């Protein structure tokens, strides 16, 4: 198969391939970018594979950076762009089902492609637009099928994260997993416990944000892979609820919303501990935990002005999106009205602060001062007090007198 026209991302990188070939080596576009071009999807990263060894690659170009030279990767700075160029390689026995014990550089494109995970990711493209397909990846693309390169059992024994990648690709590409590949994923799912939580989180996160995330979750359920992921053991019912409780065409607005609804569906009692098990950042834990709290408030009643002030318009909108996807009542107009009615959106918007209370009223720093500032803040938010210096001073005097 030959492309009639090269996408602009590849055209810009063609001089890189040309330079390498003029130096006497082979060079090809490889991986996900080739797959995405053939599927008419946006290209995110342009990866280049070559028969030149790292030091040979560095000798060809003036500006290079060693970003992973032990694995054969050199970053080339050329034509206003940055390109990762990786030497063809083979990999020895994997240790801990995660990483190869040794990487060996080779001159053969086929040897390099056979170590990849799925046939649709094992395609290469030369400078003339000719697709090199050693493992029937083009047929799998046409039939929307995800199939492991070579022996599926070996691919997942080498790196068990490929199981999570399989779920993610099913979700992002809307592909079905080929039967032998699926069975190998199922039988090797216990190996996911060997994978770092951070790597699994990245794949699960991408799955949740994919347009066909239900397909990925369904495959995960069918493989019983969830039993080997943090906080998901024996959560088949919760994951099924996640799939069926939202409208078929619903996709998550952002990953905070996605993870919040995962925990809502699973009826997680301690969201922070659940997210800690996934080794997420403290900021992520705080935001998602607040989002769940606001969701539960909304289950009980309509939003009030204080809710919008404390949680923000964006978070309230994420909650309403989830309610709409469940065919529950929504009121975006109310959110907008309440937000517009807020005199302040943050305590720093208040014209009087703690320094003024210490200076003008002789208050001391401590709990009493903090409590007074909270009273002022609440009164302004609820509309009982104008955000005016003189008015606030009068309010404080009255409070101190009681």
UniProtKB/Swiss-Prot annotation:
Provenance organism: Streptococcus pyogenes serotype M1
Residues that hold CTP according to the record: 32, 35, 116, 159, 162, 165, 168
Lineage, opening ranks: Bacteria, Bacillati, Bacillota, Bacilli, Lactobacillales
Reactions catalysed, as given in the entry: a tRNA precursor + 2 CTP + ATP = a tRNA with a 3' CCA end + 3 diphosphate; a tRNA with a 3' CCA end + 2 CTP + ATP = a tRNA with a 3' CCACCA end + 3 diphosphate
Subunit structure, interactors included: Homodimer.
Cofactor needs: Mg(2+)
Residues noted as binding ATP in the record, renumbered to the chain: 32, 35, 116, 159, 162, 165, 168
Keywords associated with the record: ATP-binding, Magnesium, Metal-binding, Nucleotide-binding, Nucleotidyltransferase, RNA repair, RNA-binding, Transferase, tRNA processing
InterPro entries (alphabetical): Bact_CCA-adding_enz_type3_sf, CCA-adding_enz_C, CCA-adding_enz_firmicutes, NT_sf, PolA_pol_head_dom, PolyA_RNA-bd
Gene Ontology MF term list: ATP binding; CCA tRNA nucleotidyltransferase activity; magnesium ion binding; tRNA binding
A Pfam family: PolyA_pol_RNAbd
Protein function: Catalyzes the addition and repair of the essential 3'-terminal CCA sequence in tRNAs without using a nucleic acid template. Adds these three nucleotides in the order of C, C, and A to the tRNA nucleotide-73, using CTP and ATP as substrates and producing inorganic pyrophosphate. tRNA 3'-terminal CCA addition is required both for tRNA processing and repair. Also involved in tRNA surveillance by mediating tandem CCA addition to generate a CCACCA at the 3' terminus of unstable tRNAs. While stable tRNAs receive only 3'-terminal CCA, unstable tRNAs are marked with CCACCA and rapidly degraded.
Residue numbers binding Mg(2+): 45, 47
Highest taxon of source: Bacteria
Extra information: A single active site specifically recognizes both ATP and CTP and is responsible for their addition.
Sequence similarity: Belongs to the tRNA nucleotidyltransferase/poly(A) polymerase family. Bacterial CCA-adding enzyme type 3 subfamily.
EC numbers: 2.7.7.72
Primary enzyme class: transferase
Protein name: CCA-adding enzyme
GO biological process, one term: tRNA 3'-terminal CCA addition
